[in-house]
Amino acid sequence: MALNMGCVSVTLSDEQQTLFRLIEDTDEHVFITGRAGTGKSTLLQYFAWNTEKQIAICAPTGVAALNVEGQTIHSLFRLPIGLIAESQIEQSDATRRVLNAIQTLVIDEISMVNADLMDAIDRSLRQARGKRGIPFGGVQVVMFGDPYQLAPVPPRGDELRYVQDHYRSFWFFDAKVWTGGLQGQGGSSGGSGDQLLDLGEYGTRLHVHELVHIHRQSDDGFKAMLNAVRYGRVTADIAETLNTQGARTPPEPEPGEVPIITLATRNDIVNSINSRHLAALAGREQIARAEVSGDFGRGEANYPADSELKLKVGAQVMFLRNDIAMQGSRRAG
């Protein structure tokens, strides 16, 4: 099945189409995971454009929420930052009206959501909808994310002590709302599968499905190396190949040559490299100042880009979001 979103045509694979029908035609809770490039974001976008259900899309951070044209979890549910535990959840009439209108709640980057916040979402929906005995107040919950890529912020202090006393771990799947154990119906960490997670006394269940077809890479050897890194099974040969190709200082570009992109582990290293190359360009520096609206949670640290963007003629620009223009489309990255 294909969909034309502006100038960009999206066609679902068979496994994506099967999952779309599951979340569209049923009220089952679904967790969709998969390696980078398997189409999680594509499926989420397709569902948002095609569903006949009343949905709300949210994510744990401002950047993640912006990417899916949603809200942060804390903004949607009006939850306080930090440990929520058993504290009273205050809800205005406006918040209750919003939460009562939702048929399906979509959460992106679910792996960054901790167990305490997952339970707070459950309690908020039960409370707002007046259905305290039904998980999520009867709302279908569809979650996208990959625990192998992003983890919750590790708890500290009182929050750590609370998590240790009340949960098996701080991961979302150890929240009280998801109790019981995985009961496999086929599938494994390396293949596709539809698994079920029992929900304790309420008898509901979570479908866990892993997308397995990688659309972003076509080189089988490279994909095998990426999988080895992902699962912690790097052999000496793989390590040597990766170190030979990647763990080296790139040469300085020749005059007029475009610099090689450098991947770094910290923002300060990246910013230093970019500032050095920008300063080397001739011409006057121009500053574009952001117009900020909406809730980004914790201020500038959660902005998708700097509030002041410094540019010169000849500077390279990387798109953080796809731009669908009249003349065609420009892709993020």
Show where each model-derived region lies.
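Conserved ATP-binding/catalytic motifs of P-loop helicase motor domains
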Residues: 1-333
